[in-house]
Amino acid sequence: MSDYGLDLQFGVFLTPSAAVPQQAVDLALTAEDAGIDLVTIQDHPYQPKFLDAWTLMTYIAARTERVILSGNVLNLPLRPPAVLARAAASIDLLSGGRCELALGAGGFV
């Protein structure tokens, strides 16, 4: 099925809860098994109850084979642009091209 000339993709939005760290990974694996195309992770580095989005995306990339990974939404003011670009490029290389950037100005800054 296509929409505006692009294939329609389906994704899941995972909460990176530090209380049960494996839960987000298990949900990502289940999503991949179910044929979901995209796994996104909340990026709230100031939230002590959450895992770091970039570390979690890297771990999920290592455990999955097909799903696209993205932060949802990566808050630009919270990281230096060069650090953010390098992290995204590193995950993209390590995952075989499965990292996509979703950037935002930030809602809580």
Regions found by a protein language model. Name each.
Residues 64-74, 98-100:
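Short, basic, helix/turn surface patches
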Residues 45, 74, 106-108:
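Catalytic metal-binding/acid-base residues of hydrolase active sites
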Residues 1-64, 68:
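N-terminal beta1-alpha1-beta2 module of alpha/beta enzyme domains
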Residues 48-49, 71-79:
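Active-site nucleophile and cofactor-binding loops and adjacent substrate-binding regions
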